[in-house]
A protein has these predicted regions:
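Cytosolic regulatory regions of ion transport systems
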Residues: 1-94
Length: 94
């Protein structure tokens, strides 16, 4: 599956790590540049650095995603990311 994860703190990172072991293609959207660099160097994922806005979700290719997982610490950001992800074409959102 093609999966986009928004937010790669403790929870998002753990989800990405687990899904990689299951053989999924993962793209991570992370707003913190240091965290994005860390993820890029430790996991075999595509990292899109920036906030989870429409432009960044397009860059993350959400339109082709089977699943978008919003895992930020902000409920508002998670909800909006899922709504935008659906509008852009993500098959499922969490």
């Amino acid at each position: 599956m093609k999966i986009v994860i928004v937010g790669a703190g403790r929870v998002g990172y753990a989800i990405a790590e687990q899904l990689l072991t299951e053989g999924h293609d993962i793209t991570v959207v992370e707003s913190d540049p240091e965290r994005a660099a860390y993820i890029s160097s430790t996991l075999d994922v595509i990292v899109v650095e920036g906030r989870a806005n429409v432009d960044q979700l397009r860059i993350a290719n959400v339109a082709d995603a089977d699943l978008l997982i919003a895992a930020t610490t902000s409920d508002e950001t998670n909800l909006i990311s899922c709504m935008v992800g659906r509008k852009l074409g993500a098959t499922h959102t969490i």
